[in-house]
From Swiss-Prot:
This is Nuclease SbcCD subunit C. It holds the Pfam family AAA_23. It comes from Staphylococcus aureus (strain NCTC 8325 / PS 47). The keyword Transport does not apply. Residues 176-364, 392-502, 535-802 form a coiled coil.
Length: 1009
């Protein structure tokens, strides 16, 4: 990620400020300088806040970023443009605030844009989703951004001096190693669940085994005494247990079947005796009821005589009733005939009146026919009357337009001829322009090659001079080194080792006496005097140390010079002097000017010709359009004339209005005549139809009357014949019989009921006599006692069998469940063994006591340290190397860092370093961390880094080394920005971003020293 432009509004001390990072050429190193509190670190805060909504340091909250001098109605916002993977993005973040005069907070806003074809297009417009978009785009979150892009004040050396637990948190964030801890937790939970399931399965097996029914059987009890943990023994005993249970069930079933058969015998015997007893009682009762029924026989015979007489008189009564109905019909027919005759007379009168109206209408027939003829002939004109009326209105306008269009067309033709004369034989020559452009490009390339070669030669001479100077220094230092090594070899180092043993020799002398045996060599001690000059030895040792220190310093200088020569050689190898033209710059510039003038002249000529051609095409198009309009005008004018002629010929009118008035009047008269004529015809037809209907009705009524009279005569004859057959003389006899008809239904029901009961008694008595014949009735009480005894015994055995059967089936189900649990348990133990082992390994139960996450973090830390040591060796003059401490720290292994001093060949705690040495180590470690994260993250583009930390703790030489390290970062294509108050940096770094403060707000500007 490379910053391009930063705009701040009401952010920290910046009320309205813009910083253009595009002024930084070729990713050069630049310094951010200013007084304390001017807002230098706020620039880093602004970039971090724009991307992630957080400051560059964790201690600063979002509310602390808003300027105290900001307008209460204006929001705090940051707009940040940056380049990533050759694509340009812009983010605009507005912080939440309570607007002056409001009580509710205005929410935060965040927009993400991407430049496409020179314009910004929005990608996200919500705070949460936009921030997530930036995290996915950059490949880092805010914490990782602080470690990789911005090394903030106070946090620069945090990673170096932190303990293992703190480093674990930092590395976990940078390398996303929480997934390995999550794997450990998942495996731990999985093992916990599996162990719980296994224990639960053992408990289920034990519970099922304890619930198996023994039936108080010694064999089963013996089988159940096996412990449930002995699952193999359980598998052996289960078939034996099931077999013994089946034997017990079979024995109980046999007793049950015997009891059921005995009960069925006594049950059948009891049922048959009860049925016989009921049949005898029923037979006696039916015989008594049958005798009582026979006593009603005389009454039933009288009822049957009355019913027979009622049946015989039925026909006579029907004839009498029919006579009354026929007489009523005859009277109604006579009334209908009279009404119909009156209706026919009224219809004849109405027809005579309508005939008079029809005759008067026919007298106007000739006049109507002439109007119909006119309407038919001119109907087509009236239907399109607007067309003809418009023709009268348009004809004069079209004549005027035609004349005007003709004049305009002639003017355009004359203009076209003038343009064609101007063009003449001239033609556009674009090939010549291409040829001139190519020539100019080639000349520019030759000029650039000459300039680049001159610049490269100057740079080469400078580098060769630097290389020669470095080689001379190396030769001089090599000569001095050889002299020092020769001087060092002259010392006898074997005689200098006693200096370290001075206290040891003194202790031995104090513990022995003359004449004792020496504890070192075993000889007799002759003298305890001083035989060793320790002062002389110490002096020579100091001289040797001084020589060795000088040798080491010279070797370091030689190594540095060799490194510088290597760097110079790389620059020399990168210098490329190209083949250049034989012409001088003056000649090439003159040729360039001539070709550029020729190119401009040809472009002007082409432009003039194209303008003339464009004007010609425009005039041609106008002529064509005018001709089309003129043709259209003539066509419309001819059409108007034809329509007017057609109208006047057919209508004999020369005025549209008069024609319309007469036509509508004729149509109205014809319609009125036709409607009235149709109305009269409809009335005549209706009268004719109504008269025909009434005539048919009259004939129908007369025929009905004749039929009714004939029916009445026949009915009278039938009445006389029936009275003669029944020996009835007058109507009084008939009335008496008719009085019985009200009781007929009751009499018939009484007779039918008697006959039905009589028949039922006969059938039932015969049936019961057949069922009780030759059968003996037993003692019911004895049978009942025996029945209850057998039933109780049977029920007891059925219940016992049901219980035993249920318990046997339950035992089978439980043993099957036990077998299933055992099989599943064995398979589960087999399958989960590897998971148990894996869980122990990743949880730290291994030979190194390392969890999986710590193992991964140690791998990354080793890579970071290796990368950091490449720079630390240069910055510390090959004295210090960072190493990882192997000892356990606070329960975490190997995440703390020590420093190894090559001068003393010993490792020591990082806190023993001076302020400058700590800065060197922190810078090397931070840069190593940055590079390793970039390698591992796959896609993070680290094209810039900003450092806000103490260069003031460094001496002059160390400061130079640190600057060289940062300059090397520039050569890798990374922009490097530094915040510092060190005045030496202002002299060494040519580009400075100066931050000035006027007490309440700050401003920035780039300047060069």
């Amino acid at each position: 990620m490379k910053p391009l432009h930063l705009k701040l509004n009401n952010f920290g001390p910046f009320l309205k400020e813009e910083i253009d990072f595009s002024k930084i050429d070729n990713n050069e190193l630049f310094l951010i300088s200013g007084k304390t509190g001017s807002g230098k670190t706020m620039i880093f805060d602004a970039m971090t806040y724009a991307l992630f909504g957080k400051a560059s340091t964790e201690q600063r909250e979002e509310n602390d970023l808003r300027s105290h001098f900001a307008d209460g109605k204006q929001p705090m916002s940051v707009t940040f443009e940056f380049q990533l993977n050759h694509r340009i993005y812009k983010v605009h973040r507005q912080g939440p605030y309570i607007k002056e005069g409001n009580t509710t907070k205005t929410n935060a806003k965040f927009d993400v844009f991407e430049m496409v074809d020179g314009k910004y297009e929005i990608r996200e417009s919500k705070v949460i989703s936009g921030t997530q978009f930036i995290i996915e785009l950059l490949g880092v979150n805010a914490d990782q951004f602080r470690q990789l892009f911005i090394l903030p004040q106070g946090e620069f050396k945090r990673f170096l001096i932190s303990n293992s637990r703190e480093k674990q948190g930092i590395l976990r964030t940078l390398f996303d190693s929480e997934k390995f801890e999550a794997i450990r937790e998942i495996l731990k939970e999985e093992v916990k669940k599996e162990k719980a399931q296994i224990e639960n399965r053992y408990q289920q097996i034990d519970l099922l085994w304890q619930e198996i029914e023994s039936f108080d059987d010694d064999n089963i009890k013996g089988l159940l005494e096996v412990a449930t943990q002995q699952i193999d023994k359980l598998i052996e005993n289960i078939p034996l247990l099931q077999a013994r249970s089946k034997e017990i069930l079979a024995s109980v079933n046999e007793s049950k079947e015997t009891a059921i058969k005995e009960f069925e015998i006594i049950e059948k015997k009891t049922l048959e005796n009860n049925i016989l007893k009921d049949n005898i009682n029923q037979l006696n009762k039916n015989k008594i009821d049958f005798v009582q029924l026979n006593e009603q026989q005389p009454e039933i015979e009288g009822i049957e005589a009355k019913l027979k007489l009622l049946q015989d008189i039925t026909n006579l009564l029907n004839y009498i009733e029919n006579r009354e109905k026929i007489e009523t019909k005859i009277a109604n027919s006579k009334k209908d005939i009279s009404k119909t005759n009156n209706k026919i007379l009224n219809l004849d009168c109405d027809k005579r009146n309508i005939d008079k109206e029809k005759k008067m209408l026919e007298e106007n027939g000739d006049l109507i026919e002439s109007k119909i003829s006119f309407i038919d002939k001119t109907r087509v004109l009236f239907n399109d009357i607007n067309k003809y009326q418009q023709s009268y209105l348009n004809i004069e306008r079209l004549r005027t337009e035609g004349e005007q269009l003709g004049d305009e067309l002639n003017d355009l033709i004359k203009g076209l001829e003038t343009v064609e004369d101007s063009i003449g034989n001239n033609q556009s020559d674009y090939e010549k322009i291409i040829e001139l452009n190519n020539t100019i490009t080639n000349i520019n390339n030759e000029i650039n090659i000459i300039k680049e070669n001159e610049k490269a030669k100057a740079e080469l001479d400078k580098l060769l001079g630097s290389k020669q100077e470095l080689e001379n220094q190396i030769n001089e230092e090599t000569s001095i080194l050889k002299n020092l090594e020769i001087k060092l070899d002259r010392y006898d180092k074997t005689k200098l080792d006693l200096n370290d043993k001075e206290s040891f020799i003194s202790e031995i002398k104090s513990a022995v006496n003359i004449g004792d045996q020496c504890p070192i060599c075993g000889n007799e001690i002759q003298d305890l005097g001083h035989h060793i000059d320790f002062d002389s030895i110490a002096k020579r040792q100091n001289e040797i140390k001084e020589i060795e220190a000088n040798i080491h310093a010279i070797k370091s200088n030689i190594a540095v010079h060799n490194s510088e020569i290597k760097f110079v050689n790389e620059k020399i190898s990168n210098i490329n002097i190209k083949t250049q033209s034989d012409f001088s710059l003056e000649v090439l510039n003159k040729r360039l000017l001539e070709n550029e003038n020729a190119l401009n002249n040809q472009r002007d000529l082409n432009k003039f010709i194209e303008q003339m051609k464009e004007e010609k095409d425009n005039l041609t198009l106008q002529i064509h359009n005018k001709q089309l309009r003129l043709n259209k005008n003539e066509s419309e004018l001819k059409l108007c004339r034809d329509l007017i002629t057609e109208f006047e010929t057919l209508s004999k009118y020369n005025n549209i209005t008069n024609f319309e008035v007469d036509y509508k009047k004729y149509v109205q008269d014809v319609n009125q005549h036709q409607e009235l004529s149709k109305e009269i015809e409809d009335k005549l037809m209706q009268l004719s139809q109504r008269k025909l209907i009434e005539q048919n009705n009259l004939n129908h009524y007369e025929n009905q009357l004749e039929t009714y009279n004939n029916d009445l005569e026949l009915n009278e004859q039938s009445i006389e014949m029936e009275m003669s057959r029944l020996n009835l003389t007058d109507d009084n006899d008939i009335d008496e019989i008719i009085a019985w008809r009200g009781e007929q239904e009751e009499l018939e029901q009484k007779r039918d009921t008697y006959k039905k009961r009589y028949h039922e008694f006969e059938m039932e008595i015969a049936r019961l006599e057949s069922l009780t014949k030759d059968k003996e009735l037993l003692d019911s009480d004895k049978l009942k006692d025996e029945y209850e005894l057998k039933k109780g015994k049977m029920n007891t055995l059925i219940d016992e069998y049901s219980a035993v059967h249920y318990q046997c089936q339950n035992n089978i189900n439980k043993t099957q469940s036990i077998v299933s649990h055992i099989n599943y348990l064995n398979q589960e133990l087999k399958d989960q063994q590897e998971i148990f082992q894996l869980a122990e390994i990743v949880s730290g139960k291994n030979n190194k006591n390392l969890t999986l996450e710590n193992f991964v973090l140690i791998y990354y830390l080793d890579q970071i340290i290796a990368q950091a040591n490449l720079r630390l060796a240069t910055m510390s003059d090959n004295r210090y190397q960072l190493i990882r401490r192997e000892a356990v720290s606070h329960g975490l292994s190997g995440l703390e860092i020590d420093v190894f001093d090559l001068h003393s060949n010993k490792s020591r705690h990082i806190s023993s370093l001076s302020g400058g040495e700590t800065f060197q180590s922190s810078l090397a470690l931070a840069l190593g961390l940055s590079e390793i994260v970039q390698q591992q993250s796959g896609g993070i583009s680290l094209t810039s880094i900003f450092i806000d930390e103490g260069f003031g703790t460094l001496d002059q030489e160390t400061l130079e080394t640190a600057l060289d390290t940062l300059l090397n970062l520039k050569s890798t294509g990374r922009m490097v920005g530094i915040i510092s108050h060190v005045s030496e940096l202002k002299n060494r770094i040519p580009l400075v971003l100066e931050v000035k403060s006027d007490q309440y707000q700050s401003s920035t500007r780039f300047k060069r020293n």
